[in-house]
Amino acid sequence: MKKRAKRELKEEEDKEEVLCCCEYVNRHGERSHVAACCCDCEDLDDVCDRFLKREPQKPESLSHVSAVVFDRIRVPWFWGGARKLDLSIVPPLVLLPALLHLAAFHFLLGVLVLTALPGLVLWYYFFTHRKKGRTLFFLSLALFSLGYMYYLFVSEVFPRGDVGQGELAAVSVGVSLTLLTLIYTKRDPGIVRLDQQAVHSTVTYYSTLPDNDSSFNGGMQEVSMTAVQRIGSSEQEGLELKESGRRNWCSVCRVVRPPRAGHCRICGVCVLRLDHHCVWINNCVGQANHVSFLLTLVFFLLTSLYGIGLVLRSVCPQQNVLTALLYCPGVYTHYSSALCFTCAWYCSIVTGGLLHLLLVQIINISYNVTEREARVALREKTARSACWGLVVDTGVYSRGLWSNWSEFMSMGDKLRLSSPTDLV
């Protein structure tokens, strides 16, 4: 008994020990080491054994092997043990520069690459969206695109002498502001906590109080109610409260969602005033980070449009900036000019998609409706839509353009100032 107790005590002490930079806890909850990544893999041994014996593989064998491989691909980290490396961040780092340089060789190659690239990204989006899984592919593509375009602007466009120091500084400030707002957007979107089960909606409803009303005497209202009426009223309120709680109850997070909150199946959490899950930031957009998300879009679009104008003015000096994308003779004469022109086209495609996203966001905020509420209302046919579904008005929370924008800009402050003591 003493030996058993000592062994259990030693195991508990081992678990409580801090992981070194090369250690980690695997998917089975066991302590492992990066150096042992090629050791003791029963799933891989079973697959190889069946292959050599020419026996049929189990249906789940390959998925188990891939799970083990992805779990063991880690990099040493200074604190918290070795970190898992998501391989989905690698393709953008390799394919984006290769495809852009390939497209710069000839006009037809540019058309082929710039047409196929958005199609491949959309295919991968629908593929991952159907599986409801998280991926760093889109965040990696967004960050690397921003960094790589800035690198080419500094290394290829600026040395040509057509861009001044002030213009370079303006682009640098725009990139910095975009990254700062993106970092802030990546924080907590407003996750519904266990102590927020009774949080009410931040939407304020206004009603006029009659000046001359016989039921109001000096601010006091006389109400007469019999015992039977009180019992009936209490039962009715209890049934309504129970029905509301059942409707807003999240069986996954085990919390009662406040009004306008929603559950994200990708992140696996409930978010206050959930708008949508944005794959480009690998995070939800909710009450706490919606304003910073909008600022990120604005800063990026302003920087991108300004940078595209500077690039086209440099590589197509004889053409108008508005028409240079469609007609720029002699741009493929020099490889450097062709590469800058190709990158300008790539940025224009990305900018066009984000302009559409910004337009949808502005319209939804003006009508005080989230993207999630708009989709649900269109599916249930409970909203008015216009402009081919671009404008969706549910008529539930809208209180006018100015009030809707005021509520949107201040909803993050209400979330920070709220506490369990002032919630009723």
Annotate each language-model stretch with its function.
Residues K2-D211, Q287-V424:
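Hydrophobic alpha-helical transmembrane segments that serve as membrane anchors
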Residues A169, E235-E237, C250, R265, ...:
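Eukaryotic intrinsically disordered and solvent-exposed regulatory patches
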Residues L209-R230:
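Long, low-complexity intrinsically disordered regulatory regions
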Residues A227-E237, G245-S251:
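Short Cys/His-rich Zn2+-coordinating modules
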Residues E237-G245, R254-P258, C270:
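Short, flexible, mixed-charge glycine/proline-rich loop motifs
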Residues C250-C253, C264-C267, C278:
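Short cysteine-rich clusters marking metal-coordination/redox-active sites
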Residues P259-G262, R273-H276, Q287:
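Short, non-ligating residues that shape and space the ligands of small metal-coordination modules
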Residues N283-C284:
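Interfacial segments of multi-pass membrane proteins
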